[in-house]
């Protein structure tokens, strides 16, 4: 690729061997050709380090030849055998003798000298048409630093031959330019090169003659008001040089031409050289004030604008043209630097935009460095290229460029800070939650406030690191304090939310603890309901609890449990760095929740089945046990009805007692409204939304405290009373039946008969110590069995054992009979005699039935005992 490119460039340069045509003979400007030529000659990026020279003179006077010898150019020259126009329009070429130095190395040609060969005047091709002469002169004066006037020695003193008409035009044009831009004096150098100078007339005399002509020309032109007394020296500098005849003195011509070429270097004004006194500088011709201050890369556009105004006969306004050029070039430079800027920044913008669409904020690595480097590079490159142009336009465009760049970079910064904000909040939340879970998992305890404060410091430090690494220090939007403040504010809000959630979890744990404690304590109170008299529920020691103070005990247990829970909650909340308002809200919610727990437990214990069971147990404790807690053995002589009535009425008094939550001390409901307290002013709707209404506390619910304390309605109480009475009646009937069944039916004469017939045996037993001791042991065992009410179970066990032995004996007998011949014959005989034996069987069954009827009362007595 490199050799091919080099070959193409060589071909392009060869095509411009004779220079480039700036304006053709038809007054058309060749802008593309000029830009291309300057680029090929490496002048485009020279900035102000270039110089422009134009040559004037009559047609066919050797202007192109002079330029070719001076600057090594290859302008077309007239053939010596023909006298015709060679240069058409205006041509331009770069100095080919660049870097040439004098023999003593004291002088060196300037770099990047551009030479314009202007079409000669007074040519027969244009005849009377002097329009192009005037326009080309105006163009050359507006663009060139040095105007070379090519004149033969013998033409000095002539008007037409010395191009006095053209010079008059130059003077008039210069005044025209001055009027358009009074702030700038468009100074130029008129360099008279006197050709075919033989020295007969001294050069100083020729200078005097030409300067007199210049003064007369200046005086003859019409001047605007205020410039009537101006001098030609106010606008032009003059230098003169004589060259030998090219044909007759070729060697001297070449030598002098080389010597003259070294005059085309940069120089400084010498105050001692005053043209008014006939002293002309022989130093470098390129003074700083001659330069038109048009950068090389904008020359083509500037020249085109100048020529457009000239060719359209518009007043030439160089400041306006310079501003237009500056605007055009600044826009071009801005586009170029923005392309490079886009290459660096667009990928970050796309990544950020994609992350925003996906809802996954991402902190882009390397964004800050890319922003700073791309911004600095773009602004510096723009400054290097555009600062050469009109200052006002440049500054305006620079601000425009900075605004354009900063708008995009600021958007990137905002996106980066937003990403850091969102990701930081998420990471903060996850870190706090993880630390809390870790503390809960290890069971070592944790300080929530310390965790939150530590994570807040980490989050803020990370956010500031991202912000500092992203901001561009030299910009007006480098301050991110507002964003940091918003971030810290949201961190505080999230911290508060996490603290409230943690306090909610703490409250839930405390509520579960309250629920567990109340469940046990309240359950014990209900289980002990009426058990203080006797029975399995009676306490082993101490006084029996009063049934009237049942709700007092429940309330005291409840208050003590909740106070203990409040202390736990307050101690734990202090590690959360919670405010007093938040603690007040938490305690208020705890009291309300605890009341709900108590009420739920009471409702559970007071369900119809549970309450009916407890009432029956209470009744049975009073009915089946005496005041000492000894079980009653019912006898016919006992006042069963009286005991039953007292026990039933005593138990029935529990139903109205349990129907309403009332304290025995005050005969009124507990002060639930005062105990819970008013709703804290800092409570939010979210704090209240999960709380059920409480009668007497939440007045807007329309439920009074009396209604809140009602456990059983009247209908439920009546229904419960009826069912309890039925259950108590069943117990009473059972007791009555037991007492009646225990009465003996043995006649009195039986005891006399038993004594008479068994006297001998009685005496024998009494006289024999062994028999007596055995009788004593049996009597003691019978008494103990009676006292423990074990006769019934013993008799039942004996009957069951005898029945089982009878069944087993029958089974073994049948097996024996079936296994012997005699038995099988007997079975066969019994089968054949089944008909005759049925009546006997019926008799036996009838007898057994009768015996059974006779024995049943005795069996009942045995069971009761």
Swiss-Prot record:
Residues 478-504, 699-719 form a coiled coil. It is found in: Endoplasmic reticulum membrane. One of its GO terms (cellular component) is endoplasmic reticulum membrane. Its main location: endoplasmic reticulum. Keywords: Coiled coil, Endoplasmic reticulum, GTP-binding, Hydrolase, Membrane, Nucleotide-binding, Transmembrane, Transmembrane helix. Residues 1-745, 791-865 are cytoplasmic. One of its GO terms (biological process) is endoplasmic reticulum membrane fusion. Residues 686-699 have a biased composition (Acidic residues). One of its GO terms (molecular function) is GTPase activity. The keyword Ubl conjugation does not apply. Cooperates with the reticulon proteins and tubule-shaping DP1 family proteins to generate and maintain the structure of the tubular endoplasmic reticulum network. Has GTPase activity, which is required for its function in ER organization. This is Protein sey1. It comes from Aspergillus clavatus (strain ATCC 1007 / CBS 513.65 / DSM 816 / NCTC 3887 / NRRL 1 / QM 1276 / 107). The gene is sey1.
């Amino acid at each position: 690729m490199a050799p091919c490119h080099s070959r193409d460039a060589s071909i392009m340069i060869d095509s411009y061997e004779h220079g480039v045509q700036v304006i053709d003979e038809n007054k058309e400007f060749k802008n593309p050709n000029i830009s291309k030529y300057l680029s090929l000659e490496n002048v485009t990026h020279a900035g102000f380090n270039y110089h422009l020279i134009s040559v004037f003179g009559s047609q066919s006077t050797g202007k192109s030849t002079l330029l070719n010898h001076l600057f090594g150019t290859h302008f077309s020259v007239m053939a010596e055998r023909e006298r015709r126009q060679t240069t058409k329009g205006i041509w331009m070429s770069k100095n080919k003798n660049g870097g040439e130095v004098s023999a003593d190395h004291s002088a060196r040609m300037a770099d990047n000298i551009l030479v314009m060969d202007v079409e000669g005047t007074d040519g027969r091709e244009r005849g009377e048409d002097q329009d192009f002469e005037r326009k080309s002169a105006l163009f050359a004066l507006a663009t060139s630093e040095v105007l070379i006037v090519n004149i033969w020695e013998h033409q000095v003193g002539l008007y037409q031959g010395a191009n006095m008409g053209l010079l008059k035009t130059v003077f008039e044009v210069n005044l025209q330019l001055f009027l358009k831009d009074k702030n700038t004096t468009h100074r130029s150098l008129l360099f008279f090169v006197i050709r075919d100078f033989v020295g007969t007339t001294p050069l100083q005399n020729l200078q005097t003659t030409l300067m007199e002509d210049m003064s007369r020309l200046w005086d003859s032109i019409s001047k605007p008001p205020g410039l009537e007394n101006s001098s030609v020296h106010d606008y032009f500098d003059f230098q003169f040089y004589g060259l030998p005849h090219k044909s007759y003195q070729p060697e001297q011509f070449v030598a002098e031409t080389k010597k003259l070429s070294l005059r085309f270097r940069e120089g400084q004004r010498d105050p001692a050289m005053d043209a008014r006194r006939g002293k002309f500088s022989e130093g470098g011709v390129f003074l700083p004030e001659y330069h038109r201050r048009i950068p090389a890369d904008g020359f083509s556009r500037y020249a085109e604008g100048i020529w457009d105004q000239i060719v359209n006969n518009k007043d030439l306004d160089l400041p306006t043209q310079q501003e237009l050029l500056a605007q055009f070039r600044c826009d071009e430079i801005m586009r170029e630097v923005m392309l490079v800027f886009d290459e660096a920044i667009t990928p970050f913008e796309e990544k950020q935009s994609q992350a925003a669409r996906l809802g996954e904020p991402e902190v882009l690595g390397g964004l800050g460095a890319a922003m700073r480097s791309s911004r600095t590079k773009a602004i510096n490159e723009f400054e290097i290229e555009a600062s050469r142009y009109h200052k006002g336009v440049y500054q305006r465009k620079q601000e425009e460029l900075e605004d354009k760049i900063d708008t995009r970079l600021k958007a990137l910064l905002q996106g980066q800070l937003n990403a850091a904000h969102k990701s930081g909040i998420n990471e903060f939340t996850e870190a706090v939650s993880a630390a809390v879970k870790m503390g809960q998992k290890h069971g070592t305890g944790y300080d929530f406030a310390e965790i939150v404060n530590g994570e807040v410091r980490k989050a803020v430090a990370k956010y500031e690191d991202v912000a500092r690494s992203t901001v561009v220090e030299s910009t007006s939007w480098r301050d991110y304090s507002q964003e940091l403040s918003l971030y810290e504010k949201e961190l505080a809000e999230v911290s508060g939310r996490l603290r409230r959630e943690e306090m909610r979890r703490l409250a839930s744990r405390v509520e579960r603890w309250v629920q567990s404690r109340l469940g046990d304590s309240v359950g014990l109170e209900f289980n002990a309901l009426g058990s203080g008299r006797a029975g399995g529920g009676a306490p082993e020691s101490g006084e029996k609890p009063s049934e009237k103070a049942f709700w007092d005990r429940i309330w005291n247990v409840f208050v003590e449990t909740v106070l203990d829970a409040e202390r736990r909650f307050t101690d734990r909340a202090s590690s959360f760095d919670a405010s007093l308002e938040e603690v007040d809200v938490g305690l208020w919610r705890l009291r309300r929740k605890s009341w709900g727990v108590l009420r739920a437990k009471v409702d559970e214990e007071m369900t119809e089945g549970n309450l009916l069971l407890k009432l029956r147990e209470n009744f049975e404790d009073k009915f089946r046990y005496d005041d000492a807690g000894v079980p009653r053995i019912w006898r016919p002589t006992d006042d069963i009805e009286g005991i039953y009535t007292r026990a039933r009425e005593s138990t029935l008094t529990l139903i109205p007692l349990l129907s309403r939550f009332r304290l025995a001390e005050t005969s009124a409901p507990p002060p639930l409204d005062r105990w819970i307290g008013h709703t804290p002013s800092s409570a939010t709707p979210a704090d209240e939304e999960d709380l059920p209404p409480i009668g007497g506390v939440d007045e807007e619910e329309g439920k009074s405290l009396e209604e809140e304390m009602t456990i059983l309605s009247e209908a439920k109480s009546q229904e419960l009373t009826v069912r309890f009475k039925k259950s108590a009646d069943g117990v009473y009937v059972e007791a009555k039946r037991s007492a009646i069944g225990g009465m003996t039916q043995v006649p009195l004469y039986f005891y006399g008969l038993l004594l008479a017939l068994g006297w001998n045996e009685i005496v024998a037993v009494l006289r024999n110590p062994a028999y007596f001791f055995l009788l004593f042991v049996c009597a003691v065992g019978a008494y103990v069995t009676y006292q423990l009410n074990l006769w019934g179970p013993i008799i039942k066990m004996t009957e069951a054992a005898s029945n089982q032995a009878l069944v087993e004996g029958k089974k073994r007998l049948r097996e024996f009979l079936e296994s012997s011949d005699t038995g099988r014959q007997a079975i066969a005989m019994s089968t054949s005699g089944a008909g005759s034996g049925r009546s006997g069987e019926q008799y036996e069954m009838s007898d057994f039935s009768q015996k059974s009827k006779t024995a049943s009362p005795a069996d009942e007595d045995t069971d009761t005992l």
